[in-house]
Amino acid sequence: MIQENKKTIIDTFKTHENDTGSPEVQIALLTERINHLNEHLKSHKKDFHSRRGLLKMVGKRRNLLNYLKDRDIERYREIIAKLGLRK
């Protein structure tokens, strides 16, 4: 992921000025990496090592989404809507 792209994602989803680790930021960064890896796997179908990494990232994102849903349902709904995940 390009550093400038990462910075724009952090700026978009941060909850306060120095925020880099909130669940929203982590979910947004993981979503970007997942989308990038999906494009890679479309052209490299036999790259099973990357596919395993993709599955780990999807699992981590799912855990963060579940955490956010348990803690603050409004923030969960907001991040789902912004990223276009689920429904």
Curated annotation (Swiss-Prot):
Could you list this entry's UniProt keywords, alphabetically sorted. Answer: Ribonucleoprotein, Ribosomal protein, RNA-binding, rRNA-binding
Keyword Ribonucleoprotein listed: yes
Give the PROSITE patterns listed for this entry. RIBOSOMAL_S15 (PS00362)
Q: Per its UniProt record, what SMART domains does this chain match?
A: Ribosomal_S15
Q: Which Pfam families match?
A: Ribosomal_S15
Give any GO molecular function from the UniProt entry: rRNA binding
Q: Give the family from UniProt.
A: Belongs to the universal ribosomal protein uS15 family.
The UniProt subunit note reads as follows: Part of the 30S ribosomal subunit. Forms a bridge to the 50S subunit in the 70S ribosome, contacting the 23S rRNA.
Q: Which NCBIfam families match?
A: S15_bact (TIGR00952)
Q: What does this protein do?
A: One of the primary rRNA binding proteins, it binds directly to 16S rRNA where it helps nucleate assembly of the platform of the 30S subunit by binding and bridging several RNA helices of the 16S rRNA. Forms an intersubunit bridge (bridge B4) with the 23S rRNA of the 50S subunit in the ribosome.
- What name appears for this protein in its UniProt entry? Small ribosomal subunit protein uS15
Q: Which organism is it from?
A: Alkaliphilus oremlandii (strain OhILAs) (Clostridium oremlandii (strain OhILAs))
Gene that specifies this protein? rpsO
